[in-house]
Amino acid sequence: IPKKIAFVQCVGSRDEKAGNLYCSRVCCMYATKEAQLIKEHNPDAEITIFYVDIRAFGKGFEEFYRRAEKEFNIKYVKGRVAEILETPAKNLIIRAENINSGELIEEEVDMVILSAGLVPAATEEIKKTLKIPVGDDGFFVTAHPKIDPVTTSLKGIFTAGVAEGPKDIPDSVAQASAAAMKASIILKG
């Protein structure tokens, strides 16, 4: 059972080199939740989360993150991981910079969990068949991301969930309800 565990946030997102400039919106809270679950099952585990910025979208998420720090002793380090190396003993060495202190960190851990950014799942075939425009980020474009995030440029075609952009499950369910309502209006004529 791994005792020292590190989470690395924003892998492949918020990164110009990777081509994904957007935040996936869910990774910080998922990592925090997983870290808490690990601590519940293994209280002696030492967990470090390396992050760029903690993004706590949603009601109660900021408190959830603070609770992880205080009650579960989960360590958060602001900084990008530069390198992960394997030791002869098959452990991993993480090299990173703590942005807040300027300190270079080299930490040996038993396990590294990468929080990879969300990417659009729409295949080229779906895009060509439906002829719905996609943005530079690859997600479907809607009438307006805040006012009307489900209506596409094609009458009767609606998006929901991560098809339109990164979001969590409650936001996806709410958006799916809105899309279903708009579709039912068309069907009722």
Segments predicted by a language model, with ranges:
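Residues forming the flavin
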Residues: I1-G189
